[in-house]
A protein has these predicted regions:
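Membrane-embedded alpha-helical bundles of multi-pass transporters/translocases
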Residues: 35-44, 49, 131-234, 239-295
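Intracellular loop-helix junctions on the cytosolic face of multi-pass helical membrane proteins
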Residues: 1-124, 147, 151-157, 297-301
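Membrane-helix interfacial "entry" motifs
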Residues: 19-28, 125, 129, 203, ...
């Protein structure tokens, strides 16, 4: 570890405080500021779930769903899926036969529940715009063990990406989420024209699967960036400025939330694919930037 270690004793306790040279302190603060600059644009894109993605759900997404797709709009079905995911995770992680048996029973019960729910489907299910807000927290819970398994396997092989690289990958994944939205929007009317078409009864709508898939991708990007970013700040921040640097992370998040309005400014008379294209561009430029300074970030990490 760079720098000197200063020890102070108080009774039987010994506290070690890392002392950095002015040069090391400066390098770490600069590295953190570079990360803050990047995450601003991630949160700007990610928090479109409360703005343009909700507009899209309200104005361009089908108002009903049938068949297997409709099961995603029942919270109990989502809970069953979570039980299956964690049951599988436990099944492969357990070292005793009893634990594996319990995990297997949980999985079978959840599958039986889903099978029963599917057989009981009758007609269509209404789909309102606010219901799409359930998918981000659902995917956070469901994907956490998946991401742990992936990076655990990479770590055992000595190939796990560093925290700064995960942040860059998170930006690329976020870009992929809005690329999905671009594909879903080709051929659609502008929001203003869609509003007129809805009033005239001639509007066309897209499948809810587009938004569900986008939330899936964006949530995986969040799992790459958010916990890794906080961990990076905690690890790299100079001891004297740790609180300030952690505050800087939340300031960057707040600025990103404020900038979500940029997409709303062009929502109206612009083709939808251009709106999503702006967000794709922001994420890609941010990813290119963080990979261009990766050596500086990994040096202090």
């Amino acid at each position: 570890m760079e720098g000197n270690i200063k020890q102070t004793s108080a009774g039987k306790e010994t506290t070690k405080v890392e002392e950095l040279s002015p040069r090391e302190t400066k390098d770490r603060i600069i590295a953190l500021c570079l990360v803050f600059a990047v995450v601003i644009f991630f949160w700007m894109a990610f928090h479109q779930n409360g703005l343009t993605l909700t507009y899209f759900a309200d104005e361009f997404t089908a108002k009903s769903s049938t068949g297997l797709e409709s099961m995603m709009f029942d919270v109990w079905n989502l809970v069953a899926i979570i039980f299956i995911v964690y049951g599988l995770f436990s099944l492969f992680q357990s070292s005793t036969g009893k634990s594996k048996a319990i995990s297997g029973i949980v999985i079978l019960l959840a599958l039986a529940f889903l099978g029963y729910r599917y057989s009981s489907l009758n007609g269509s299910v209404p789909v309102d715009a606010p219901i799409f807000q359930q998918f981000n927290p659902f995917f956070v819970v469901a994907l956490t063990p998946v991401s742990m398994a992936i990076f655990g396997a990479l770590s055992r092989k000595g190939k796990e990406p560093s925290a700064p690289r995960k942040i860059g990958l998170g930006m690329l994944v976020a870009a992929c989420g809005f690329i999905l939205m671009m594909f879903s929007s080709f051929g659609l009317l502008t929001p203003e024209a869609q509003s007129e078409a809805i009033q005239a009864g001639t509007a066309s709508f897209v499948s809810p699967n587009w938004l569900i898939s986008t939330y899936l991708v964006l949530t995986f990007g969040e799992l790459l960036l958010s916990p890794m970013g906080i961990s990076f700040v905690s690890k790299v921040a100079p001891p004297k400025y740790k609180g300030m640097m952690m505050g800087g992370w939340f300031v960057a998040t707040a600025i990103g939330n404020y900038l979500t309005a940029v997409a709303a400014w062009i929502w109206g008379d612009m083709p939808l694919w251009i709106v999503w294209g702006v967000l794709v561009g922001v994420c890609l430029v941010s990813a290119v930037f963080i990979f261009s300074v990766m050596k500086k970030l990994e040096k202090v990490a």
